[in-house]
Amino acid sequence: MDACVSMSENYFDEALPRLLALLNDPDPTIYRTAVKGLGVFGHGVLFPLLDLYDKTDNGTVKACCIKAFVQVAVNFPDAVFPEQAIQALKLALDDINPVVSQSALMTLGYFSKQEHEKERVIPILIQVCNSTNIAHVQSAVMSLAEIDSTEVDQCFERMINHDSTDVLIKEILEASMSRRQSLFGN
C-alpha cells in the first residue's frame, strides 16, 4: 500500500490512467489490486471512474468502478461524494448485470453507515425494498438493519405487514428487526 500512497502523492497524473486501464485486465488479482490502489488516490479519481463507468460495456469494469468508490470512502471517510456518484449508483441498481447491481447495493450499504452520506442513501435503499428483485431487497434490508432511523422502522413495518411481501423477505425482515432491537432498543 505504501507504493500506492507514493504514486498518489508523486505520480498521480502518470499512475491514474494506468490503474484505470488495469480494471480491464482479465486477471482478478490485477483488477482487484487496481481497485484498492485507486482508493488511495482519493476523490480525484471519482470523475475518471464515472467517465470509465459510462463508457464501458464490460460488467466487470463497471463493478470495479463502483467498488473503487468504497475504497475511496474507506481511505477518506470524511469526504463527501459528488451527487453524480450517488446518481450513478442509483442507476447501476437497474443494470442487467447482477455483479454491477449488487456492487452498487454493497456500496450504497457502506455509504448508509457514513453520517454525511446516509441522508442521501437511506431513501435509495428504502426504494430498493420495493423492488421485485428479491436479492436486491435482501441486500437493502440487511444494510438498513444496522441504521438507527425512523424511516427504516416505518419501511420494515410496512413490508412485514404487507400481504404481498415474499415469505423469504419476511423472514429476513424479522431477523433484521430483531437485530435492530438489540442494536438500538427500538
From Swiss-Prot:
Membrane-spanning ranges: none
Q: Which domain of life is it from?
A: Bacteria
A cellular component term from Gene Ontology for this protein is: phycobilisome
This chain's protein is named Bilin biosynthesis protein CpeZ
Gene name, Swiss-Prot/TrEMBL: cpeZ
Q: What does this protein do?
A: Involved in the biosynthesis of bilin.
**Organism annotation:** Synechococcus sp. (strain WH8020)
Give the record's keywords alphabetically.
Antenna complex, Phycobilisome
